[in-house]
Amino acid sequence: MKSKVRLLLVSLLFVAPVSVYAQKDSVWLKCPLDEAIIVPPPKNVMKFDEPDLCVGLVSVPDTTVKACITGRVSNVIQNEDEKWDVVFYYRDYYFWYSGLSKVIVKKNDNLKVSQPLGYITPGDKLELSIFKFETPLDPTRFLDCKVVMKTD
């Protein structure tokens, strides 16, 4: 009986810290647009070695783009198409927002969850990419948006 109890205690000492450490690294993200619809990529797109793990978000009533997590702005870029990109980071994660029509943050600004960082034109798509260091991650695994559009 004592050996079973001892084995149980030893296993708890090793298993509990590992599971707590694994949970510590997961990231849960608030949706950057209220009432957003996640738009899947088109079916007939070219496939490359690296999957494009970007997700598109559309929201008719909401055009204010908000931070999905607390972080710090590392870059604000205007593209050739006059749209803006905002990149910010939290721990080892980088969040890349593309397609903003107006930006209200600047490099090195600290962001809080749900803090506005810019706007999109009504009907336009906001693209979100997530990276852990340089490795792209699937945003749908972490994003808390309510509706996913079906493409049948």
Regions from the PLM with identified roles:
Residues 1-26:
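Bacterial Sec-dependent N-terminal signal peptides
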Residues 22-84, 112-113, 140, 150-152:
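Surface-exposed, glycine-biased beta-strand/turn segments
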Residues 54, 92-94, 125:
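Conserved catalytic core of two-component sensor histidine kinases, primarily the HATPase_c ATP-binding
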Residues 59, 67, 90, 99, ...:
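Conserved strand-loop elements at the edges of beta-sheets that form or border functional pockets
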Residues 62, 70, 78-79, 89-93, ...:
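Solvent-exposed coil/turn segments that connect beta secondary-structure elements
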Residues 76, 90-114:
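Short histidine-centered loop motifs in beta-beta connectors
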Residues 80, 97, 106, 137-139, ...:
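Intrinsically disordered, low-complexity acidic/polar segments
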Residues 87, 110-152:
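Conserved, short, structured surface segments that act as functional micro-motifs
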